[in-house]
C-alpha cells in the first residue's frame, strides 16, 4: 500500500535499466531517500502500467535513482512518476491474520481486499535502549529437545539450519501453534526469495493443521508476507521489513508476544547485493554489498524484546557451499542467540523433531539464566549422547557384547534419551495419528533426570519413542508389557 500526499510532486522518468529507474523532479522538490514513487497510467503503447519504486540515491541535477518493487516492463522515458511523500506502508493489526501479502502490503491470495485504514511505514528506527527488556527470559516452546538443550530467548533470534526434507517447516508450524495456544501470541511469516511452490505448500499445510482458518481469517494465528524467487531484487530486499513491520504492531500496540519467521535470511542479503550492484556501488568481499553489516543490522536490531512485548525470531539460514566463513552467514551469526541444527541422520531414523542435540547451541544455556538443575541435566544428556557417538565405531566392528558394563549402560540410556527427545506434534496429528503433546520445561527436566539416574533402566527403549512426558513413557511401557 502506498499513500499519496495531497500536494502531488510529479517528476519524469529519464532512464530505465532493468529494475532501476532514474527520474527528474522539479527544483527544490526532490523526494527523500526511501520515499515510495508511483508510476501509474498508460504507456505510449496503450498498456496499463502500475509500478512502485523506492528512492535509493540522489544523483544531483534534480535526479533520483530508485529501485522497482515489481517488473519494469512497459516503462518508457518521459512517463510521469509521482512522489508519494512517504515510505512504502503496509496494513497492520488483526486484518493481516490469515492473509498473504506482497512487499507493498497488497493481498495476493484472491480473498478480497484488506482494510487499509491502519498502515505503518516499513522503515522505522529500532526501539530505544531504555525501552528494551534486558533481563534474559527463556521462551518455553513445549518442544522437549529445544527447551532442554537449546532454550530460546524471549525476543531473541534463532538460526534454523537444515537441508530439504528434514522438518524445518513442521517445527515452524508447531512453534506457531504453541505460541498461539500457550502464550496468546501471533506469528508473522516472511518468505524472502524462496520458491513460490514452497510458499503455496506452506499456506495449504497451515490450513490443514488449523493454523489458518480460511472461513474466518481473523481467527488465524499467522500473517504471511511473500517476496519469492521470481520477484525483482527490490521486492526480495524489502519483504523482510514488510513482515517485521506487521510483527512490530502486534508487539508495540497489542502488547503481544510475536514469533517472526524469516525464510530465508540469506536471500535478503543476496537481494541487497543485487541492488547494490545495480546502483553501481563498489562490491566488497566475495562480491557482497559494501553496506552488508548495516543492512543486516538494520533488520536484526528491530527484532527484540521491549518492556511491552517481544518479537522472537526464527530465521532459516542457507549456508552457501556449506562455507560458514562466507560473509553473509558470518554476518548473520553475529546477531543470533542460538542455533537449531536439523540432522538428516536423525530424520532417517524416524526421530522427529530431528534437532541435533550435539550441534545445536544457545547462549541461554548458562546456570545463571536457566538454573543449576536445568544446566546440569542438559550437559549430562549431551555428554551421554557424545559418549554413545564415540562408541558407535566399536559397536559397528565388534558388537555390543565387547563393551564394558558401564559403556553398555551408557549406550542403553543414550538410546532411550535419543528416543525421548522425539515428540508427537499437534500440527502433525493428521499425518502420524498420534495426538500432539506440549511438555512443560519442569516435566522435561524431570523425565531426563530419571533416565540419567537409572530409574528407568528396566523400561524398553521403544516406550520412550514419540511420547510427551515421562509418565506417558511409563504408561506406554506397561501397555507394551501386556502386549
UniProtKB/Swiss-Prot annotation:
Enzyme nomenclature, EC number: 7.1.2.2
Broad class of enzyme this protein falls into: translocase
Primary location group: membrane
Annotated PROSITE patterns: ATPASE_ALPHA_BETA
Localization (cell): Cellular thylakoid membrane
Alphabetic keyword roster: ATP synthesis, ATP-binding, CF(1), Hydrogen ion transport, Ion transport, Membrane, Nucleotide-binding, Thylakoid, Translocase, Transport
UniProt function note: Produces ATP from ADP in the presence of a proton gradient across the membrane. The catalytic sites are hosted primarily by the beta subunits.
Classification via HAMAP family: ATP_synth_beta_bact (MF_01347)
Quaternary structure and interacting proteins, as annotated: F-type ATPases have 2 components, CF(1) - the catalytic core - and CF(0) - the membrane proton channel. CF(1) has five subunits: alpha(3), beta(3), gamma(1), delta(1), epsilon(1). CF(0) has four main subunits: a(1), b(1), b'(1) and c(9-12).
Name of the protein in its database record: ATP synthase subunit beta
Organism per entry: Rippkaea orientalis (strain PCC 8801 / RF-1) (Cyanothece sp. (strain PCC 8801))
Amino acid at each position: 500500500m502506498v499513500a499519496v500526499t495531497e500536494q502531488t510532486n510529479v517528476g519524469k522518468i529519464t532512464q530505465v535499466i532493468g529494475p532501476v529507474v532514474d527520474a527528474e523532479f522539479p527544483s527544490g522538490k526532490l523526494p527523500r531517500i526511501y520515499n515510495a514513487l508511483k508510476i501509474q497510467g498508460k504507456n505510449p503503447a496503450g498498456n496499463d502500467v502500475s509500478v512502485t519504486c523506492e528512492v535509493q540515491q540522489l544523483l544531483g541535477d534534480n535526479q533520483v535513482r530508485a529501485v522497482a518493487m515489481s517488473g519494469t516492463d512497459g516503462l518508457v522515458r518521459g512517463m510521469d512518476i509521482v512522489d508519494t511523500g512517504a515510505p512504502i506502508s503496509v496494513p497492520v493489526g488483526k486484518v493481516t491474520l490469515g492473509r498473504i501479502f506482497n512487499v507493498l502490503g497488497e493481498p495476493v491470495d484472491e480473498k478480497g481486499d484488506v482494510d487499509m485504514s491502519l498502515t505503518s511505514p516499513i522503515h522505522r528506527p529500532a526501539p530505544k535502549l531504555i525501552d528494551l527488556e534486558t533481563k534474559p527470559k527463556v521462551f518455553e516452546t513445549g518442544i522437549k529437545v529445544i527447551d532442554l538443550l537449546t532454550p530460546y530467548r524471549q525476543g531473541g533470534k534463532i538460526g534454523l539450519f537444515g537441508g530439504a526434507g528434514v522438518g524445518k517447516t513442521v517445527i515452524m508450524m508447531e512453534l506457531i501453534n504453541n505460541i498461539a495456544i500457550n502464550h496468546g501470541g501471533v506469528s508473522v511469516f516472511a518468505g524472502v526469495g524462496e520458491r513460490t511452490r514452497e510458499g503455496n505448500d506452506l499456506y495449504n499445510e497451515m490450513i490443514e493443521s488449523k493454523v489458518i482458518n480460511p472461513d474466518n481469517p481473523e481467527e488465524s494465528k499467522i500473517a504471511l508476507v511473500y517476496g519469492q524467487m521470481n520477484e525483482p531484487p527490490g521486492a526480495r530486499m524489502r519483504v523482510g521489513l514488510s513482515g517485521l513491520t506487521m510483527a512490530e504492531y502486534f508487539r508495540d500496540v497489542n502488547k503481544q508476544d510475536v514469533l517472526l519467521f524469516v525464510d530465508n535470511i540469506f536471500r535478503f542479503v543476496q537481494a541487497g547485493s543485487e541492488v547494490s550492484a545495480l546502483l553501481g556501488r563498489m562490491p566488497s568481499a566475495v562480491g557482497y554489498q559494501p553496506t552488508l553489516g548495516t543492512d543486516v543490522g538494520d533488520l536484526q536490531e528491530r527484532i527484540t524484546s521491549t518492556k511491552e512485548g517481544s518479537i522472537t525470531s526464527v530465521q532459516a539460514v542457507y549456508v552457501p557451499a556449506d562455507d560458514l566463513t562466507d560473509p553473509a552467514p558470518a554476518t548473520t551469526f553475529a546477531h543470533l542467540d542460538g542455533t537449531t541444527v536439523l540432522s538428516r541422520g536423525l530424520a532417517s531414523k524416524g526421530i522427529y523433531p530431528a534437532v541435533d542435540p550435539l550441534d545445536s547451541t544457545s547462549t541461554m544455556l548458562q546456570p545463571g539464566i536457566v538454573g543449576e538443575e536445568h544446566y546440569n541435566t542438559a550437559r549430562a544428556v549431551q555428554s551421554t549422547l557424545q559418549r554413545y557417538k564415540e562408541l558407535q565405531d566399536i559397536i559397528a566392528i565388534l558388537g555390543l557384547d565387547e563393551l564394558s558394563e558401564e559403556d553398555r549402560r551408557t549406550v542403553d540410556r543414550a538410546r532411550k534419551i535419543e528416543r525421548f527427545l522425539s515428540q508427537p506434534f499437534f500440527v502433525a496429528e493428521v499425518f502420524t495419528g498420534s495426538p500432539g503433546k506440549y511438555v512443560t520445561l519442569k516435566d522435561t527436566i524431570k523425565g531426563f533426570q530419571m533416565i540419567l539416574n537409572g530409574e528407568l533402566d528396566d523400561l524398553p527403549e521403544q516406550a520412550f519413542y514419540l511420547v510427551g512426558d515421562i509418565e506417558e513413557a511409563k504408561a506406554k511401557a506397561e501397555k507394551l508389557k501386556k502386549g
